[in-house]
């Protein structure tokens, strides 16, 4: 998928255009086939997190500000989201965020094994119609790409407000066998985790159910 530069929604504002022209090269991860060196990318950081499909970057920027010892890679092909991320990085003066303005999967393939401490898949594109389900990100083949890159004991968070995606994703994670569902009580997946930061998409409440939150520990 060659998706960088996907537009949609509003055109970029003049400030966003300037950010893209002047700052993208500073914070983007370079294209290429070579393996990523996360220690070189984030000097002095010892933990590395990944957010796939950061949308308007609210969650990624807030997590980066709250966790300055962590290096965070965010993936998002949409121009507007990338511009928002660059704005957030600059406004918050962050030194621990890098963006991949494209499909996350080829980037994940370039990561060394067992390098990630956390991953977030928050409100991924719902593809609600049955015939569209095959386009959903969380599928067995995606877990096979992601799992080897996560450290044993690392955490992965998935959230959605689409019931069929919640059911399908939970089944996919649990039946994979390498993702231990951390449901502390029968109901805790109904509440946002304490360290969650509300996203723009989440607050639109476009789905057909209340948001659900699934945290997993990597086996
Ligand atoms: C429904 S939006 C949610 C955005 C954000 N997580 C939020 O909660 O506001 C899903 C986002 O995932 C992005 N996305 C979809 N497939 C992706 C992929 N393979 N790699 C990276 N981002 C992807 C889309 O561009 C979109 O911005």
UniProtKB/Swiss-Prot annotation:
It catalyses: guanosine(46) in tRNA + S-adenosyl-L-methionine = N(7)-methylguanosine(46) in tRNA + S-adenosyl-L-homocysteine. It holds the Pfam family Methyltransf_4. Substrate binds at residues 129, 161, 199-202. S-adenosyl-L-methionine binds at residues 51, 76, 103, 125. Its EC number is 2.1.1.33. GO terms for cellular component: tRNA methyltransferase complex. Belongs to the class I-like SAM-binding methyltransferase superfamily. TrmB family. Catalyzes the formation of N(7)-methylguanine at position 46 (m7G46) in tRNA. This is tRNA (guanine-N(7)-)-methyltransferase. The lineage of its organism: Bacteria, Pseudomonadati, Pseudomonadota, Alphaproteobacteria, Hyphomonadales.
